[in-house]
Design a protein with these regions (language model features):
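Extracytoplasmic/secretory soluble proteins
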Residues: 1-323
Length: 323
């Protein structure tokens, strides 16, 4: 909408003159920032990490380690296996920490419906990565509406069944995100359909209380064995969202210089690591390491990132990945 209404400046010339670190950070991906073949303008620097390899994943569904332990750490690969583990655990442990056990909880009263209702339906029913409300058939080079795809009806039938059975949180459609996080922090929600960045603070709270078994394992759950989990699928740089400069900006040169500093080694280290001697140090091999104190505090203090600034303002700015 901003581009269609001519609200953003084309940063191409400014980057050519003032953005060497921007070009260095994006490298071979730089040309992918251009809007289209018809309009090669660069309206935004994407918020996706550049050269990011998937090393760890929260899977398509999550399950408490306590439930996995109860099942001899057997991994559920299908919805039926996943549901049965939760069902059996709820029967055996109807309460956790003196509160009613919740089988699966999601929060759909605000934008989180997208990450907990829409996205999992594509992951689990179709083995499709997050492409918005669309499924991309790379072989046929076709795009079609996700919720009309094969498997979607069966996925929502499953949600309906576990709701009627009492496994799905009855407040899933009306509870606030804060309510949802509080339930997770109580340690009584067995399964999630979410991403770890969303419930991370609740896990920090659980660990600080010595309830590591109530944190979550990311699992490759799909609707049946014919569907392949998409969580480890490598994808190209996502350029659909990011940070741009509006035409009302009084000093676009200064704005680009700031973005260029963000992309510099100095800026990237400060945003991601903090201050040398306080949050990190260099070992005898010249490798940057987080201090033991910060490592321990980051595991138990839900305000660590906000308090120290480490990792707090990485998004929505450009950032190096882990490659």
């Amino acid at each position: 909408t901003l581009i269609q209404n001519d609200a953003l400046i084309d940063m191409s010339d400014l980057i050519d003159e003032y953005g060497p670190n921007i070009k260095k950070l994006y490298g071979d991906e730089y040309e992918n920032l251009r809007y289209s073949s018809d309009d090669p303008s660069i309206y935004q620097l994407c918020s996706d990490k550049v050269q990011e390899e998937t090393l760890e994943t929260s899977g398509t569904a999550q399950l408490q380690w306590a439930v996995l332990q109860e099942n001899g750490y057997q991994i559920p690969y299908t919805l039926d296996e996943y549901t049965q583990m939760i069902r059996d655990y709820m029967v055996k442990y109807p309460t956790i920490n003196e509160k009613p056990t919740i089988g699966i909880s999601i929060a759909c009263s605000d934008w989180h419906w997208y990450t907990m209702l829409s996205n999992p339906s594509g992951f689990i029913a179709n083995g499709s990565p997050d492409n918005g409300q669309w499924i991309v058939d790379e072989d046929k080079e076709e795009v079609y509406y996700k919720h009309a795809a094969d498997g979607q009806k069966e996925y929502y039938e499953w949600l309906n069944e576990i709701y009627n059975e009492g496994i799905l949180d009855p407040e899933f459609a009306t509870q606030t995100h804060e309510d949802y996080i509080m339930k997770i922090a109580d340690g009584r929600v067995l399964g999630l359909l979410d991403k770890d960045w969303d419930y991370a603070n609740a896990e920090v709270s659980l660990r600080s209380e010595g309830q590591d078994e109530r944190t979550y394992a990311g699992l490759p759950v799909t609707i049946d064995e014919s569907v392949k989990c998409p969580s480890l699928k490598q994808r190209s740089l996502a350029v659909g969202w990011g940070i741009g400069i509006t035409k009302s900006c009084k000093d676009p040169v200064r704005a680009v210089k700031f973005l260029d500093w963000i992309c510099s080694d100095e800026g990237q280290i400060l945003l991601n690591w903090g201050i040398e001697g306080v949050n990190y140090y260099y070992d005898e091999n010249g490798k940057r390491c987080i201090t033991e104190e910060d490592l321990e505090v980051s595991k138990s203090d839900t305000n660590y990132s906000e308090r120290t600034g480490v990792g707090f303002r990485v998004y929505p700015f450009p950032s190096y990945g882990n490659e």
